[in-house]
Amino acid sequence: MAGMRIIVISDIHSNLEALEAVISSMGSFDAIFCLGDLVGYGADPNEVVDKIRMLEPQVVIAGNHDYAVVSGDTSGFSSHAALAVEWTRRTLHPRNMSYLAGLPHCSLREEQGLRLGMYHGSPREPLDEYVFPGTPEFILRSMVEYAGVDILMLGHTHMPMQVDMGSRYVLNPGSVGQPRDGDPRASYLILDLDDGHVRFELRRINYDIDSAAEKILSKPVPKFLADRLYLGY
């Protein structure tokens, strides 16, 4: 059985410059898994959704911002996040709104003899639960068992996480478009599967933050959304 290389991305948040830099760095791969939040915060929602559609990922699931843009429900969102959602709703083309509306909230599949589970938040709350780095291992194990998988892939926190629990793994690729771990570079994960064997590598990629931030400043959204790109938080 030939091995499989999967590119895992998440939390692009309408940041076209970051997404393009990540795509340029990917090299060869067999599949792309996108763990949600294509839109929100950033200045290029249509361009990002178009780019993802063009890539034809094997897995694309909805994040909480994607759901909020489709539904209009921003309950629980901060004021700056809600303003970005409202602007995105006014800006998004109908074809891209329909694409987001059709995204599932999770994906389960088997590859290379391993069961994979993809959620934006968690198996218990696919859109909204945060599973941060440092979460106790017994909690992570309970999530893996709840999902019935060998490898659990999550997004939402914008913080990379790779936890190896022997034959079970919890992975978060971090955020392409708005990292929050103190490193402003775009973040994604390379996952290599080969007949039950697992290897993974986190990659950080420089991108044109100035351009992404300037475009945000030209939109009717809070200035903070541009500033935080430089902070990585």
Features from the language model and the residues they span:
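Short acidic-hydrophobic surface loop/beta-edge motif
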Residues: 105-113, 163-165
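Active-site environment of divalent metal-dependent phosphoester hydrolases
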Residues: 13-18, 40-43, 65-70, 124, ...
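Anionic-ligand binding region
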Residues: 130-173
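Acidic, His/Gly-rich catalytic cores of divalent-metal-dependent hydrolytic chemistry
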Residues: 151, 163-233
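Active-site-proximal segments of metal-dependent phosphoesterases and phosphodiesterases across multiple
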Residues: 2, 75-83, 113-147, 179
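A short acidic, helix-capping loop that chelates divalent metal ions and anchors anionic groups
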Residues: 68-72, 125-128, 211-213
